[in-house]
Amino acid sequence: MSNETITQAVSERYARAAATGEQICCPTGYNFEDLRTFVPEEVLKVSYGCGTPAGLDTVRAGETVLDIGSGGGIDCFEASRRVGPTGRVVGIDMTDEMLAIARRNAPIAAANLGYASSNVEFRKGMAEAMPVEDGSIDLIISNCVINLAPEKRKVFHEMFRVLRPGGRFTISDIVSEHPVPNYLNHDVEKWGNCLSSALQLGDYVSGMIEAGFLGIHQIRSIPWQEIDGIHFLSITLTGYKLPAAVEPNGVRFATLRGPFSQVVDELGQRYQRGVPQAVNARTVQLLKTPPFEPLFLLSETPLSLEPSDARWLAVLPEQVPCVWRGDYAMLTGPFADVEDDDHHVFRRGSPLEICSKTLKVLESDLYRRHFAMINRAAGEISGSQVACSPTGGCC
């Protein structure tokens, strides 16, 4: 199918939903009871998403927020509440019917919030060519939309263009664990259902890094659907457009605290837990972003850690037999690859089969935020305990 055919089919699907209230298959999590206090019912009826509200927990008063694929405006109106009357919200959408609903209800939502006028503007446009000024946005949000775009890498480059240096995105979307085959890619209906259009997680993130984003990490992920053996996940990711690097005041070394024994960051720098590593200004800037900062110590002089140090982070597997239950783990970030204390090497976006002992480690607080989990066994397992290797070690 051509890009034009895909775009037209998706637009018609959402236009029909706007007119009829048709439900589109996306795993939503809106708190409608709260939203009804200021969002009109007409908007709530045409609200679809896969992670809700996408990224708005980090909004600060007075910021400018962009919603890609704003639909009827639900996330824009929630953003409006959070940025306050001094902030600004821009929503872009390609479907006239959705834009009409959003524009019609903007003054109502503003009045319900007690604002003198609406601080939300809805613009018609494509995600691959956004009608938004360069460097004008503090936060980009998007809710189960980018996977519908035929040219996702263009979308990521557009996101980078419109963000201010130091800006960030938080987007929820559908990704797959394996490549989506051609017979699904050419299924128009499944494009509208966020399935045929899904990228593998690794390809999704690599497109963002290629556009210039760093510090890309998971906020949450949940299994969604399985079609012909392909698992689809709903995932929410955050990343940053770092400002120009400046020489840090005194920081010359970084020491990995854990919980991994080794990691490689998005700039290709390798670290071993407890061992100081010389770093440049750009790396220091990256390691100061929220996903990295708790895991590193930055110092003027080399700083080593021992396992007895309270700053050392580790979660060791139990020394017991394990069970293979069909569980797979996918590293989601912010590292390119990592190694745990049982010598498993995880690469971002690549599923790795794990046993029950490793699953318990990855479900711990220190590890959970870095992984998406799927199960391929559908409950059909033997449950037999085994020693994973001749030495009794795991896997």
Residue spans of the language-model regions?
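Class I SAM-dependent methyltransferase SAM/SAH-binding core
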Residues: 61-129
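A short acidic, Gly/Pro-enriched loop at the edge of an enzyme's catalytic core
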Residues: 128-139
